[in-house]
Amino acid sequence: MEDRTRAIGDAADAMTDDELETAIAALHARERELLVAGDSEAAFDLMGTKFVLLFTLESRRR
C-alpha cells in the first residue's frame, strides 16, 4: 500500500491546483456512488486516494 500511496503522491505533485480540485471532486462523487451501492471497501480505497490529493493541495496552500 505504501508504494501505491507514494505513486499517487508523485502524480499529485505533478498536477496543477485546478487538476487536483477536479480529481478530488470526481473521486468524492464516485466515493458517494459506491457507498450508496453498498460497496464500502471500494469507497474506502477511493477515500485514501482522495486524502492524498487533499493533503497535496492543502500543503501547497500553506
Task: Please place each PLM-identified region on the residue numbering.
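Short, charge/polar-rich alpha-helical segments
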Residues: 2-22
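Short, charge-rich amphipathic interface segments used for partner binding and complex assembly
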Residues: 22-62
